């Protein structure tokens, strides 16, 4: 076990249990992630009762196998465990409530289209699982990957070719539903069904008035991009009736948005949605499926709350609401119980992937107490700050902080006015940060009057840990929508994390940093970390990145894909890896933006030939440039 260190607040020894609390891993880990007694993060890919894998040791093994950091590690066993948990929750509620139909989980591949992800999800045994496609490329993929007889739901904007492909899929033996999102799609379905010679299975997506509170609320409600209004719904039904295809209308679909934090919001919208089921049945349509869309969230921050990055319910609660409300409505109306679909892609995939990187550099404030040999000769503002360097009574801690903050503001203004020199400004800043560090050590989070100042000091005193990755490529949602992802060191968790840091990436962009961190059961602006030792590879893991992050990542500054690998666990607890994908090279990235490496080499040769270099230097330069094109954009 790692050496224990002293805790600041009460003098007791720091233990692994303290780190488990600080990083909240029990709350967001969902039984898959924990901190072992040796102070390393472990993963249990087959659930809380399965054999643990030491993640820090695993990274060492993968690096020995030739992989480099940053590294995306996928655990496909987690995918299958998530499928079993989701389908198990619905099946249990169906049995408990005596619901007279069944449930099929749909995986919307837009969440993560990686082959290993899709294949492992649909390979889960003894469950009912289907696929959803929202574009022609996705439809082409699922037509190939779905097992014969498997369910395929087609959403999104559709042209004639899209609809023809979907109908061909039906003739190939798939259970295909074409969901009408826009009135303009109706005529295309009618015409292509005649051309292909098949009775289409149609779904109707309704646009609900109800809105859920989430970062993706705009996907629901009256201003939603997709779905039919009440008037449009009646018009579409009539057009299918006139074409003699109304008996192919088999599915009702709605979507309230992704990551719905509050289950009560979902209940409110679902109450509206199931009214449409009753109305469509009353119109004589044989609707016997209901696709409740997405919304099942992930507790990213572990607070089990209505925070945007959390949920105040679990999978069983969600399944109970869907099954229970449907049964109650159908029984009251004398309607058959419909087959239930849900598109819970985030809940299925988020946990299975971890991004691992290392700290490459540390930038910290100089908060050592300065030695001032000529204090009397310093400007008044410096003398005032120097007076605050001494001991401070406990009851004066916050007052001292506010005074010091006022003084450092004055120092900045005086420098701008030319009243103090650069050296004097630097001395004032060193005094200020030394005061802040000392006061920080006196503050106690348990004392309410200290909390505001403590939060500010945690922010001001945070080190900058430069890490070997790109926020824009690997964690785009943290930048784009302020998504909170759990982050912690992979090792040294038997030691007290005695520093706080903001993680910054390699990009030449001020937004290339992570600004929110899970800290116990709250969100903070900096992360508790350890001081990086000389020559140490200090490894950081970013967890729950399996949903959307890979496919949404962009190439800002031409940082491309990282190394990635799929790690599987055998029945005996042993592991093996497969599906290794190496990082994009600089050459790959240049080609993507239509810069030909061959043309660049020609230009390099011209420049080298025109430079005042020896023959040996020319060869060395050309070799270095040629080799550079084959390297990773990330640091080696």
From Swiss-Prot:
Chloroplast is among the record's keywords: no
Keywords: Decarboxylase, Lyase, Magnesium, Metal-binding, Polyamine biosynthesis, Pyridoxal phosphate, Spermidine biosynthesis
Molecular-function annotations in GO: arginine decarboxylase activity; metal ion binding
Membrane-spanning parts: none
CDD domains referenced in this protein's UniProt entry, alphabetically: PLPDE_III_ADC
Record-level GO BP terms: arginine catabolic process; putrescine biosynthetic process from arginine; spermidine biosynthetic process
Binding site for substrate: 290-300
Pfam families named in the record: Arg_decarb_HB (PF17810), Arg_decarbox_C (PF17944), Orn_Arg_deC_N (PF02784)
Broadest EC class assigned to this enzyme: lyase
PTM sites of type N6-(pyridoxal phosphate)lysine: 110
EC number(s) reported in the record: 4.1.1.19
Cofactors named for this entry: Mg(2+); pyridoxal 5'-phosphate
InterPro entries: Ala_racemase/Decarboxylase_C, Arg_decarb_HB, Arg_decarbox_C, Arg_decrbxlase, De-COase2_CS, De-COase2_N, De-COase2_pyr-phos_BS, Orn/DAP/Arg_de-COase
Catalytic activity: L-arginine + H(+) = agmatine + CO2
Family affiliation: Belongs to the Orn/Lys/Arg decarboxylase class-II family. SpeA subfamily.
HAMAP family assigned to the protein according to its UniProt record, in alphabetical order: SpeA (MF_01417)
Function: Catalyzes the biosynthesis of agmatine from arginine.
Designated name of the protein: Biosynthetic arginine decarboxylase
Species, as recorded: Pseudomonas aeruginosa (strain ATCC 15692 / DSM 22644 / CIP 104116 / JCM 14847 / LMG 12228 / 1C / PRS 101 / PAO1)
